[in-house]
């Protein structure tokens, strides 16, 4: 009798684990956005100095006026020239910056503390460390 109850409990437990997965199909719209491309390419070491358009492209459309460019360390962000904006695809955020020769820059595109980059359903983008180095003169 005890063996039958134990076996029945194990079977019910195993079935219950799979039932929620069958009832809820995965939908890309419910996933958090991720960075899929950067300009300059993350890790680049030959970015030209001076004015430059930095672009961050996400895996899905993003909410307008929603971003959080957090410095990765003290003074790690270049000087912004103007305000960030999204291109017409609503996936690519662009900001014009001024960069100094020979300097390494880094941002967190979202972070544990700041999560302004969000899709229209308010899913914050997965934090992404974006670093690059500017060429010497």
Show which residues each predicted segment covers.
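Bacterial N-terminal signal peptides
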Residues: 9-18
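Sec/Tat signal peptide C-region and signal peptidase I cleavage site
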Residues: 19-24
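Bacterial N-terminal signal peptides that target proteins for export
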Residues: 1-8
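Acidic, low-complexity Ser/Thr/Gly/Pro-rich repeat segments typical of extracellular/periplasmic
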Residues: 26-137
